[in-house]
Swiss-Prot record:
Keywords: Allergen, Disulfide bond, Lipid-binding, Signal, Transport. This is Probable non-specific lipid-transfer protein 2. InterPro entries: Bifun_inhib/LTP/seed_sf, Bifunc_inhib/LTP/seed_store, Plant_nsLTP. The keyword Disulfide bond applies. The keyword Hydrolase does not apply. Belongs to the plant LTP family.
Length: 133
């Protein structure tokens, strides 16, 4: 069984939340609402996970790493997960195989479970996400 860094899951899954520049423009600024910081860090990953760029941008990787440093406790991870799940409902166009590539391409050691809009955030435990691989 593989284990998953929830911080990396949070970062990558949050990138799924926005599918157009109009949606990005309406995303909360850092500090606005519970998802503002998550959104701020992962917005640069959108083009890569949609297949519009061949590699994640430097800002995608730096945001991913920064968020993984900030989301530490089980409760923080669960709250970030809830934000992501709410934001991803009804979103299409995300390529899950590219989502799984972001940690590797950004130098973050992790694997990712399937990411869906009905993901059960209560499964998140401490520093490890278990049971999906």
């Amino acid at each position: 069984m593989r284990t998953v860094s929830m911080a990396a899951l949070v970062v990558i899954a949050a990138a799924l939340a926005w599918t157009s520049s109009a949606e990005l423009a309406s995303a909360p600024a850092p500090g606005e609402g519970p998802c503002g910081k998550v959104v701020h860090h992962i917005m640069p990953c959108l083009k890569f996970v949609k297949g519009e760029e061949k590699e994640p941008s430097k800002s995608c990787c730096s945001g991913t790493k920064k968020l993984s440093e900030e989301v530490k406790t089980t409760e923080q991870k669960r709250e970030a997960c809830k934000c992501i799940v709410a934001a991803t409902k009804g979103i299409s166009g995300i390529k899950n195989e590219l989502v799984a590539e972001v940690p590797k391409k950004c130098g973050i050691t992790t694997t990712l479970p399937p990411i869906t809009a009905d993901f059960d955030c209560s499964k998140i435990e401490s520093t490890i996400f278990r049971g999906y691989y």
